[in-house]
């Protein structure tokens, strides 16, 4: 059956700031306390969405979350009106304010793990929300992510959206950022590659940075998504690269159809994994980048592998990269050699995503890949699909509500909270989502 990959990109939120919240993510740590520009960040993301949609790649948008997230501050013991809660936390424990104001939901590669209908036992598209258990600021995302996905994939005959796994370290799940799918045409059954960093009883672990994904979580997600057991491979990420800042697999590998583009040090027992994939995926091609050409350190600083690998109708592929790749002489030299070599990659598209990159999120972090048949595409909430009208409406919306300068101190401004809620109220109507945000269901909280 014919099917297409639709990229659902996260729209950057109004409180995008640099707080260094993500230990193990070196860009996040390095840019802590830098002044951010939320308006520019949102526009950079929108430009990528529109350019890819114009190039013929189906594209949609996932909206930001409510931030600062007052309900969690109340759970932490801060009381009073919403304004009083903000004032108290800013004075007594400002680190909590930064955590509950993070715009991290924009990296929707961590929103969920997807199983296309061609791979599932019941013939539905399955989406399991990620619990993002390893980081407090990200663990807050799951309930609203679930509401948003249910508002977008709202036809229960075709889509099953599953709640996140229990919030315990044993079941740490980071979503599609640790998941690849390999195969022929999108509509054919594919091989799902789940990548984990640790498992109970296995002492092969990173020592410097945490392994966020567990094998136990990956296995549970595969079960929830009803993936045919014959179409699943579980593989461990190389713990040495986690210790070099590869906090998700999509920082060191990306797949599309029959191609796996990865660093030669991406996986534990890599040669064994690639042999397994060759045996099980027709026409499988591994493009392994040698450390002699691109070091792990350079891969992390440029986000070479946090790229999007997209298929044209003729079978050729486009590699979507951040500007940092073009600015690094060694990486750009390698990429031009890649273009000249015998493989399906025939074009490089480069985007300026610096606002997101400074927090450790490149092109692949910003998108959730969902393979859909024509009938399934028609069943998706049409208001989220990118086109000229939506692009212009979202640009105007960003101009109206987003600040062009934000520091950690600004997060305590009650006006920022009000601006954010008004903006999301308007956006949820624009995207025909209904009342997906807690403040909409609670009448604006206790302000």
Curated annotation (Swiss-Prot):
Any GO molecular function: N-succinylarginine dihydrolase activity
* Keyword Hydrolase among UniProt keywords: yes
Instruction: Write down the InterPro entries for this protein, in alphabetical order.
Output: AstB_sf, SuccinylArg_d-Hdrlase_AstB
Task: Kindly identify the residues recorded as the active site.
Answer: 174, 248, 365 (nucleophile)
The top EC class, named as a word, is hydrolase
Q: What GO biological process terms does the UniProt entry carry, in alphabetical order?
A: arginine catabolic process to glutamate; arginine catabolic process to succinate
EC number(s): the record gives 3.5.3.23
Keywords, ordered alphabetically: Arginine metabolism, Hydrolase
PANTHER family attached to this UniProt entry: N-SUCCINYLARGININE DIHYDROLASE (PTHR30420:SF2)
Name under which the protein is recorded = N-succinylarginine dihydrolase
Native source species:
Escherichia coli (strain ATCC 8739 / DSM 1576 / NBRC 3972 / NCIMB 8545 / WDCM 00012 / Crooks)
Q: Organism classification, top ranks?
A: Bacteria, Pseudomonadati, Pseudomonadota, Gammaproteobacteria, Enterobacterales
Q: Which gene encodes it?
A: astB
